[in-house]
Amino acid sequence: MEFRPKAATLAPFIDTLKVGDGMGHLNLTLVPLRGEAPGRLDYTLAADAIAAGVLTVTEVSEGGSVPHLAVANEATKMVLFLDGEELVGAKQNRILNTSVLVAPKSRTKIPVSCVEQGRWRYASPDFQAGGHSPSGLRARKSRDVGRTLRATGRAVSDQGAVWDEVAAVHAALGSHSPTMAMHEAIDQCRDSLDGYLKALPYPQGARGVCVSISGAFAAIDLFDRPETLERIWSRLMTGYALDALVALNRKDLPPAPRGVLHVLE
């Protein structure tokens, strides 16, 4: 089932938030968000479930289908896939179109987008957890997914726009991939990305973070508990840092007026 909380259910969740002290490195600024969440869901993260061998993600058939993957959850608790989370392997790498909670002991399909335009052949029988999408790609994808959700009830992206975003990342960073894989941009910039990760460790107790890049608002990510954010911090940060590197390399980007403090007011 897809996890799409309504505004009414989010209000008490947001009301408890407290804004922490900002921290930054080069052109990336993070403001931690702390506070208690009402209630707790019993779930495990998809990456952990895959590593534990209780969750399998495959193509929906031998022939495959670009916008969907098959999930078999053998765990006794729900499994959470995160919006923008990357899955690598099978016929081509994908990212989640939206956050999804998969019921215990169940099988389902999840909505995804391709982030490896030049491959449609098996590299492995199933998928492993990868990195996390940069916030620019997530924002573009989310706008398109939101439109199709309202119009059709289905979480479908504009696949061409996703490929354009991945190509723009490679162009800005000077990275190269024969299959135009987003993952290759991350691998080829690993030293620079690690500089951001080392300078910006997980802020203890935070269950959310507000992000700005080069002075412009980029993203807010918020979770029901600090443990979830801490667990995915390095992958989430890699996505933010990739956007920050793109901004450093693209001198033509105009400054945006909406910074972190403006958004949090």
What are these regions (language model features)?
Residues 101-193:
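Structured domain cores in non-transmembrane regions
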Residues 62-68:
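Short, solvent-exposed loop/turn segments enriched in Ser/Thr/Gly
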Residues 68-79:
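Asparagine-centered strand-capping/turn motif at beta-strand->loop junctions
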Residues 84-88:
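Short Gly/aromatic-enriched secondary-structure transition segments
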